[in-house]
Amino acid sequence: MVRRREAGASRYTQTLVFPPLLNCPRSMKIRLLLSLLLLPLLATAQTITIDRVNPTNWWVGMKNPNVQLLVHGPGAGTLAYTVNYPGVKLVKSSTVENPNYAFLNLTIAPTARPGKVQLVGKKGPQTLSQSWELKARDNTPKGQGVTAADFIYLAMPDRFANGDPSNDKFADLRDPNMDRANPFFRHGGDLAGAAQRLPYLKDLGVTAVWFTPVLENNQPLTNEGGTMRASYHGYGFTDQYNVDKRFGGNAAYKTYVQQAHAAGLKVVQDAVYNHVGNTHWILQDLPMKSWLHQWPTYTQTSYKQQPITDPHAAQIDKRVTLDGWFVPFLPDLNQQNPYVANYLIENAIWCVENFGIDAWRIDTYMYNDQPFMNRCNAALLAEYPRIHIFGESSVTNVVDQAYYTRNKIDFPFKSNQPGGLDFVLESALLAGLKEVGTPAATGWDGGPQHVYQALAQDAVYQDPTKLVTFLDNHDHNRFLSEIGDDLDKYKMGLTWLLTTRGIPCMYYGTEILMKNFKDPTDAEVRRDFPGGWPGDKEDKFTAAGRTARENEAFDFVKKLATYHRDHKVLHDGKLMQYLPENGLYVYFRYDATGTVMVASNTTDKAATLPTARFAERAAGFTKARNVLTGESLGSLATLQLPAKTAVVLELLK
């Protein structure tokens, strides 16, 4: 991306030239140049108007009484503003490079009453009055957080269920297409469909739902690798104050959250601070050059994690990692710009307060300016002390992962992020499971040793139980394919996920054995949930629509998830693990309410496990109940472990 100032143009003329535009026809370039040359003349004659104010509203009684309004419209920055509303004070009015923007700093007293605040702007004989709403806070649940007591279900709303076909297509959007036969196009899933499936999730044992972003992505189709693709994934925001109308819009999202809460489920919102879509409304009339990270020529991030934490790293390597664009159509936001920072932070608070969401997942966490992230996290936690924040930092080692969360390491920068996505444990779980039933399972550092070693490094985190654990997601190969479509490994992996420390999260369709590799593209791991669309030939939301093998998997997940939900020891209990021996891996979860023993045989042969070695945790217990089979064990002297099986025992005295 290049920012250019055309000869003879006003210094306020901002022209975004994205990589695709560099190859536009000569005639189009001429028309563009002429329009830019005429802009200063048009600006002098235009009528001043205000077309947007963000945040669109605010609330009385927030812990932070201050809010900064972004006001946009032709000439909006040339007005002198006043506010005459009891309890609302205009502290400062700021202008920036582009005269179409003003930034108004307001302080809202706790005594202010809800109502319509008039933002009055004057310039010469012209006076404008823009209404802006101040609301009363309600007492509906919000910011409840997710904890180790929860089981999160991650789904892509476009691929989960379609409850309202009337919102599948809109002619006024840049991408008016919907075609389920094309894996790269939108498929029509929406919030109405998701709401209809809440009983399904409740029955499965899920306690929280995380959707990939639902905010507006009014992006055109983009050419990626020679194929035209839609922004169905949601990571290219074009307006942070509107839920995409193909999902149902703001009203549908608010209704969905309320219905989820009524069903006893929490809602996680997927946030993106690092970038926006290149057709975001602000980018069509940029406030200032420094709103984005700008380069002389298009510069993409290296996607390398090491320069951020490397004490020996060159500054240019750090800058490319952090300030390079993620892809050409997702411009990189400059969070060191205070106006950008305020805009993003206030939108985060607005979403929690307006929609009532409970937790905050942050996309591409490691690519953000980390002091900004600390400021944003602190602002959310100040308003909602119980809210949980967990970011995506796709790293390969524990030290780098700890850098982005509250940790015990003497880093020069200290993160205040409460949680994070545990990519290190995901890698360890998959590595261990792939070697189940092979000679490597009994090796020095093979099989369950991968898992043991990952958990053995938990000392670097202030609280590892706040990390979100998972086996796959929308960017990775599906779990079942990673483990060779092996149901024994599948059950062992889910057993580990739902009984070890952390906040377990499962990707949609795992419970019905959906599988695929990201080959040739990630669309293969984002297929529609069968039965989510009217007229689907199969309905996997029902037992009758599933195969016997799929029902076996579903019932297994349900039993394990229900046990996890109902037993505090798996939420708050301590973890003690024993070094794996001969492919046998044992750990305990324990607290004052009970003790659970998980014994895994990762070899391809049945094994007898003497338990004397585990006396530190098992002493005093004489019998047990097998959580997964219901079988009662009258003695704990030895355990019989079938091949490729994890046994979950509730110890009894």
What is each stretch, according to the model?
Residues Q46-T78, E133-D138, G143:
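Beta-strand/beta-sandwich contexts
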Residues P464-D485:
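Active-site clefts of carbohydrate-active enzymes
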Residues F160-N354, M373-E383, H388, S393, ...:
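Substrate-binding/active-site clefts of carbohydrate-active enzymes
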Residues L32-L41:
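Sec-dependent N-terminal signal peptides
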